[in-house]
Curated annotation (Swiss-Prot):
Source organism, top-level taxon: Archaea
Gene3D superfamilies found in the cross-reference section: 3.30.30.40, Glutaconate Coenzyme A-transferase
UniProt similarity note: Belongs to the 3-oxoacid CoA-transferase subunit A family.
InterPro entries: CoA_trans_fam_I, NagB/RpiA_transferase-like
Entry's Gene Ontology molecular function annotations: CoA-transferase activity
Keywords: Transferase
Disordered: annotated span: 39-76
Pfam families (UniProt xref): CoA_trans
Keyword Transferase: yes
Keyword check for RNA-binding: no
Name assigned to this protein: Uncharacterized protein AF_1199
Basic and acidic residues: bias regions: 61-72
Length: 447
């Protein structure tokens, strides 16, 4: 019987009892001579043996033996029998993709990475990146469709009880308070929130009883205004659970990994800290250097809410100033609600395409609402409403006070326009605009 040959590599080999002996000159995928015998596997199984060269490189995907017949790899990891030109009943190679290394298992079991340590927190917000990609393909259209709607419609359509929600912006800067208030007004409950520098937005949702779990990086602190009395009361009372803890960088890199289509991202942070213990990260031994490296799992929120300076009706959105994590967050979330200070013609967007950090095909809803970040800051447009924030912090020291606040500013109004009238109307808003433009000095009640 003629010895089996790989049609692609034309490697010479001889059949020996119990296996295929590597002949002189036979080489691995990196061109190094193979050593020793390659055990012959049972027909059409995934356990085909692989020869190794003196550097440990496997013959693997370059030459395999199926039932004493040669095989070719064609296309994307598919194998054809060289005689019948039909696919084998089982594919014999598999690939495991990681951001820093590709392990080729050649049909044999892959040696597991050495996990040196792992955090105690639950893994939430994670899914298989390939499943996420498939979901996006099936559920998000690239059609240039008009996505404008009201805040009420956006929340009703896309935010449901128990979802994982992430809010863009930074602390008290560029946050979608109109959507936050609408979530409360519609009575959404049981949310898990990503607390990556989420302060006023997260705090208001917690005070209203909408949040059940938090992944915390920087939360509950109102900077010089002090710690949040409402969030502290909710956490200490057990109504809200902080399920994991992260650094700001780590939580943002979770979104980055998701945006890149990766299951995790490696970094040299968190190691040796209590933050790591409270996270769901893992520490492995780097297969290159042998040193420890942290694997930070990706995070795919169910819904992201991002406020921008301008957008067109299709969702092409522009942010003036620092993006923080919003570039990554927009690409990591399954659904994206964009609120904007103004809707502009698409031609206006095209005049400065480098500003368009969020393209239309990522967006599910576009909500136009001037001053939507109030009482927080919108860079270049209006300043923090310190008087209103002080009123909120004072009232939410007690449950009764929190109910009074929400009755006045959320349940007692029909929409955000009415809310803006209640907080002071155009006169108050113009004052905040002048302060942001350095034409008037701010007054800080907490001094």
């Amino acid at each position: 019987m003629a010895p089996p040959r790989c049609r692609r590599e034309k490697l010479n080999s001889t059949v020996a009892e119990g296996g295929v002996q590597a002949a002189d000159g036979q080489r691995c995928q990196r061109g190094l001579p193979l050593l020793g015998a390659v055990p012959q596997a049972a027909p059409y199984t995934r356990n085909n043996g692989m020869g190794e060269c003196r550097r440990g490189h496997r013959q693997g995907h370059r030459a395999e033996v199926h039932d004493n017949r040669p095989a070719d790899k064609v296309g994307q990891g598919r194998w054809l029998n060289s005689q019948t030109r039909r696919p084998c009943r089982k594919e014999v190679t598999s690939f495991q993709f990681f951001p820093f290394l590709i392990f080729h298992t050649g049909g044999a079991e892959m040696e597991p990475l050495e996990i040196m340590d792992e955090g105690e927190g639950p893994l939430v917000g994670w899914c298989d990146p390939d499943e996420f990609r498939e979901w996006v393909r099936d559920n998000k259209s690239r059609e240039m469709a008009d996505k404008t709607m009201s805040a009420e419609e956006a929340v009703s359509n896309f935010i449901k009880d128990g979802m994982y929600v992430a809010s863009g912006g930074f602390g008290h800067v560029r946050v979608s308070m109109n959507i936050i208030y609408e979530i409360i007004r519609q009575g959404v409950k049981g949310l898990t929130m990503a607390g990556k520098t989420s302060v006023h937005d997260l705090d208001v949702l917690m005070a209203a009883g909408c949040v059940e779990k938090v992944e915390a990086a920087y939360s509950f602190g109102h900077e010089l205004r002090g710690l949040s009395p409402a969030s502290r009361r909710k956490v200490e009372g057990g109504e809200v659970k902080v399920i994991t803890e992260w650094s700001n960088a780590a939580l943002q890199w979770r979104f980055k990994a998701a945006a890149m289509g990766l299951p995790f991202i490696p970094a040299r942070i968190l190691m040796g800290t209590d933050t790591f213990k409270k996270s769901s990260a893992k520490i492995i031994r780097d297969p290159y250097s042998g040193k420890p490296v942290t694997l930070i799992p990706a995070c795919f929120p169910d819904v992201a809410i991002i406020h921008v300076h301008r957008a067109d009706k299709y969702g092409n959105a522009q942010i003036d100033g620092i993006l923080v994590e919003d570039y990554e967050l927009a690409r990591a979330a399954k659904r994206l609600i964009v609120t904007t200070e103004e809707i502009v013609p698409t031609d206006k967007i095209r005049e400065s395409p480098w500003r368009t950090s969020i393209p239309y095909f990522l967006v599910d809803a576009v909500v136009e609402q001037p001053f939507a970040s109030h009482p927080c800051n919108m860079p270049l447009l209006y300043y923090f409403d310190e008087e209103h924030i002080a009123e909120y912090l004072a009232l939410t020291r007690t449950e009764e006070g929190a109910k009074e606040y929400f009755e006045k500013y959320v349940y007692g109004v029909n929409d955000f326009w009415e809310y803006l009238e209640v907080v002071g109307g155009s006169k108050r808003l113009e004052k905040l605009r002048r302060i942001e433009q350095l034409r008037e000095r701010p007054v800080y009640p907490w001094r």
